């Protein structure tokens, strides 16, 4: 199996491979220095992060947190022995102190370390403490090192795929919600709208992850520009969702005329096709439909009338789409002139299938 194909396997990704490598290295080093690998392995597993930035930042928090957890475990085991109350006290104190000292990122590893230490505590308290802290610290450091140096995350293709899915979901939801409004259907239309908002928030997080990565890794100006473009596309989805939400709240007082209904539905089909097109190209027929919508809206004198509001929101979506087309055309032109521009943005999606 080729490495590239293996990396794309749906259930084994970079983070899983890095976790396995961190566990293997941690165990080997622990055995070489006659340290118990249990605590080190637990730490290595729970401290693998999606970005190198997170690994470094949280690693500095987890080290003192783990030391605190081990200290509380040794102390509690000495006074109370291995009893249920000991586990409860250690867990509560560790969580409370980590929260008090703002070591939230280290709470999990500190609590796991503390609880796992209790059964193996002996009369040699100091030796136990040093051994467990050494193992836990080793696991955290190895995990951080592997996360930073091995298989750095590639958020570009992931973000591009998610942006494409967002546009497909947006076009589908837009057609569904508007059609229900036009056809006087009173079913709940906002559930999938909220799901869209959730997916959008999760996709925005990927851009944050990439910006964090750039603090520690070099990147080309073309790569940064492509991320700016993808971020602008997400901003378009965000604005479009605002209009979609308003459309979903509209309740028509009377049915549209046959002509108006046909116009709205034709415009919807055209708009959704544009949203799903990788280049978001707008054809002459769509501009003609948009002008007809504007004419129909201007004939409605009362701006508070539901039909006026519906047409106004659709026209606003059209205006946004015009901006999107121009933005995409400019970026496409730049990608053709710049060889270093990432191919996953346009080239791989516009390449004809075999």
UniProtKB/Swiss-Prot annotation:
Tagged with keyword rRNA-binding: no
Coiled coil ranges: none
TM spans (from-to): 22-42, 60-80, 107-127, 133-153
Keywords attached to this entry: Cell membrane, Membrane, Transmembrane, Transmembrane helix
Mode of membrane association: Multi-pass membrane protein
Pfam families: ArAE_1
Protein localization: Cell membrane
A GO cellular-component term linked to this record: plasma membrane
Family: Belongs to the UPF0421 family.
Name by which UniProt lists this protein: UPF0421 protein BH2644
